Structure formats: C-alpha cells, structure tokens
Amino acid sequence: MKKLKLKELESRLQEVDGFEKPKLLLEQYPTRPHIAACMLYTIHNTYDDIENKAVADLGCGCGVLSIGAAMLGAGLCVGFDIDEDALEIFNKNVEEFELTNVDMIQCDVYSLSNRMSKLFDTVIMNPPFGTKNNKGTDMAFLKTALGMARTAVYSLHKSSTREHIQKKAAEWKVKIEIIAELRYDLPALYNFHKKKSVDIEVDLIRFSF
C-alpha cells in the first residue's frame, strides 16, 4: 500500500462531506481535515496504532476520522454514532472513496463499554466537549473508549480541561500523554454563535494501559 504523506491525507479528507444540518444537542461540530490529518498521521507514524489494527471511532459523525484511518491502512475501522443522518452521509462518503475496510453502527455510545469490551486495538475520537447542555459528556465518552481499547485511546480535549483529565486518568490508573497541542477552528454553525469562527486550544491525548 502506498504510504500517504500528511499533505496528501489532508487533501483527501477535504473531500469528505460533513454535516448538512448539525444538531446542537449532540454538539455536532466537524473535525476539520487539517486536525483530522495531523491527529491520524501522528497516531500512525509515531505509535503505529492504525495500520492493520482494529480501530473504533466513537461519535464518528460523517466519518472523517474513520475514513482517514482506513486510508492509512487500518485492518478495519468501525464508526459508532447515535445520529442516523450523520451515518447516512458517512455511508455515502465511504462509497465515494470505495473503501472496504470501514463499517458503521448506529447506537448510543454509552451502551458500548460492556458489549465491546477490549474488542479494538485502538480507539480514536473527537468527543463532544461537554459544554453547553452536556456537561461531562467528554469524560463519559473517554470512560467508554478505555473499556473498548486493548492498546490505546486517542482523543481531542479542550486544553482548559487538561488538569481535570490528568486527575481522572490517575484515578482510573491509565497512562496519559499529551502528544500535540492544536488550534481547533470552530465554525459558526448555530444561531447563538456571534463570531464567524472561534479558535479553541485542544490537546491530542494518548491514553494507554
């Protein structure tokens, strides 16, 4: 399989269709191609946690992380999301790229940890940040992901929550490594957004056992 360069990966991910009507309650914000490419490229090149691995993508939305992981040679990548509309777009994206190593399951992510215990080598995710009406969602996603992964979980979290996450990781006896600090360009998708876009500082974190 041809090795993709970072720029090539980002360029391909720019062709992935995103949410048509994002749902505020589900905190649906797209993972920008640049962020997705940097995240996946680091996981692949630095830690070798994608190629030929079983990968889960929690709260996968329209599938940008799953599709990127598939392009980098994942054995199988399975996306999980509660939203049927997002998964429909995800499915179209997979068909357009003619990928055979991607699957998707509609479900409530919270119901997964018991059913999917340690079934995946790697879990990747850009969870809801748990702001607005969904306090604690990010940590609930993380807890589920840790139950599903055999090797590592890679997740994006607001840098402002770093201390809280470090405490939780210690409590759960999980190793934690901040592997990148990124600027997340959050576009104005909802009516309450006053600015066209806002930059949020996020950490790409690796959790391992």
Curated annotation (Swiss-Prot):
One of its GO terms (biological process) is positive regulation of translation. Its EC number is 2.1.1.-. GO terms for molecular function: nucleic acid binding; rRNA (adenine-N6-)-methyltransferase activity; S-adenosyl-L-methionine binding. Keywords: Cell projection, Methyltransferase, Nucleus, S-adenosyl-L-methionine, Synapse, Transferase. It comes from the Eukaryota. It is found in: Nucleus; Presynapse; Postsynapse. Ubiquitously expressed in brain. InterPro entries: DNA_methylase_N6_adenine_CS, rRNA_MeTrfase/Polyamine_Synth, SAM-dependent_MTases_sf, Small_mtfrase_dom. rRNA N6-adenosine-methyltransferase activity is inhibited by zinc. Its main location: nucleus. PROSITE patterns: N6_MTASE (PS00092). SUPFAM superfamilies: S-adenosyl-L-methionine-dependent methyltransferases (SSF53335). One of its GO terms (cellular component) is fibrillar center. Gene3D superfamilies: Vaccinia Virus protein VP39 (3.40.50.150). S-adenosyl-L-methionine binds at Q28, T31, G59, C62, V64, D81, D108, V109. It catalyses: adenosine(1832) in 18S rRNA + S-adenosyl-L-methionine = N(6)-methyladenosine(1832) in 18S rRNA + S-adenosyl-L-homocysteine + H(+). Disruption phenotype: Mice were born at non-Mendelian rates and develop morphological, such as craniofacial abnormalities, snout deviation due to altered nasal bone development and incomplete fusion of the frontal bone suture. Mice display reduced body size and evidence of metabolic defects. Mice also show behavioral abnormalities. Deletion in embryonic stem cells (ESCs) results in a decrease in global translation rate, spontaneous loss of pluripotency and compromised differentiation potential. Cells show abolished level of N6-methylation of adenine(1832) in 18S rRNA. Catalytic subunit of a heterodimer with TRMT112, which specifically methylates the 6th position of adenine in position 1832 of 18S rRNA. N6-methylation of adenine(1832) in 18S rRNA resides in the decoding center of 18S rRNA and is required for translation and embryonic stem cells (ESCs) pluripotency and differentiation. Heterodimer; heterodimerizes with TRMT112. Belongs to the methyltransferase superfamily. PrmA family. This is rRNA N(6)-adenosine-methyltransferase METTL5. It comes from Mus musculus. The gene is Mettl5.
